[in-house]
Swiss-Prot record:
The active site is at C126. CDD domains: ATase. It is found in: Cytoplasm. It comes from Mycobacterium tuberculosis (strain ATCC 25618 / H37Rv). This is Methylated-DNA--protein-cysteine methyltransferase.
Length: 165
């Protein structure tokens, strides 16, 4: 049985779903990837830890999530999603860089497709992947949401530390 809960956020409603405290989906309203909702049961108290972390993220107080995830997909998708988890807050990578990182040079388009099927948006930060030219391309939640998430992170990313001025 999958339990779900919808919360408000600065980028619109977010639906969290999973079993127990394990998150299997986090999606935005009108997101292109739509998981099957067969056997989903509403639970307004579910995923309170993840909700608290999302609220802290949007407030600029959290840069790394600590949520138990159940990511299901093909082997290639799994490799892409794990690579996304290594992109630091406030930084971006190109689709080609992710392809190279997972040992699949030339597979930038396939990385884009895997990004499009990321079941746990924001926490698995597919919004941090951009075109090789630096252009914002493709995002299941819409380019405006991608831009908003990147701007949030850029505005709150920790400054580089230096020992000497």
């Amino acid at each position: 049985m999958i339990h779900y809960r919808t919360i408000d956020s600065p980028i619109g409603p977010l639906t969290l779903a999973g079993h127990g405290s394990v998150l299997t989906n986090l999606r935005m309203l009108e997101q292109t990837y739509e998981p099957s909702r067969t056997h989903w049961t509403p639970d307004p108290g579910a995923f309170s830890g993840a909700v608290d972390q999302l609220n802290a993220y949007f407030a600029g107080e959290l840069t790394e999530f600590d949520v138990e995830l159940d990511l299901r997909g093909t082997d290639f998708q799994q490799r892409v999603w794990k690579a996304l988890l290594t992109i630091p807050y406030g930084e971006t990578r190109s689709y080609g860089e992710i392809a190279d990182q997972i040992g699949a040079p030339g597979a930038a388009r396939a990385v884009g497709l895997a990004n499009g099927h990321n079941p746990i948006a924001i926490i698995v930060p597919c919004h941090r992947v951009i075109g090789a030219s630096g252009k914002l391309t493709g995002y299941g939640g819409g380019i405006n949401r991608k831009r908003a998430l990147l701007e949030l992170e850029k505005s709150r990313a920790p400054a580089d530390l230096t020992l000497f001025d």
